[in-house]
């Protein structure tokens, strides 16, 4: 972990960094442009919604998103950043979008005509392929929708998914020709910079980096970020040490398994030794 004086830019792939850049900056175009590029849309504006979505009944569990936003005409976007591999992350994405669709249901007479829901996953691990033989090692953005199996005709435009393999992205800066590639490159490499790099002639990335600059944050924000990163590395080191010695900590294993099952960090913290903050850092 870097010393405070050595941090130039925050990591956009950790919870604090992602929300600082995309959610708290007030610069909604920083998330609008990636959504437009990845999903082929033409969004002009979005409203950032409450990240926690309660169940429709007392018995249903709540869903908490990293970011939830909507357009004026009701298109919904769920954005999730995931650092630790989860066996059922795809299923979790389906659960989140299904919950969002359920909340669009109207009382009284309703003909099931709801506005589209989009899910964007930013991953620090390799995507799991149900059909590995079809996987393209040079593909880092994976898009899914509802289609007919044989002809690939679209069944509906109401539900779409995109998963970005940030950690696996291995293109050099000079190889990044599209906005999507450049976005992936900056998301992965930003916290490694020791000096401001020469980037593409695009004001988007200038604003992105300005918002992510560690020196631009208040002292309180800097301390929160350092605490977040320390917890992340401490917990990672604990897991690495336990695995290397063949003595994996039972509480850590339990927490990871519960994350894979889709339990929230709050629920896991009540049942295991790791704190809620440590669990969120996974």
Task: Describe the predicted segments one by one.
Residues 148-157, 164, 178-187:
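Low-complexity, glycine/alanine/valine/leucine- and proline-rich hydrophobic stretches
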Residues 42, 50, 148, 165-168, ...:
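Short, solvent-exposed coil/turn linker segments
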Residues 1-161, 170-172:
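Accessory alpha/beta interaction modules
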Residues 2-7, 16, 77-82, 174, ...:
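Short, charged alpha-helical interaction segments and adjacent helix-coil junctions
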Residues 25, 38, 123, 167, ...:
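Generic structural signal for hydrophobic core residues of well-folded globular domains
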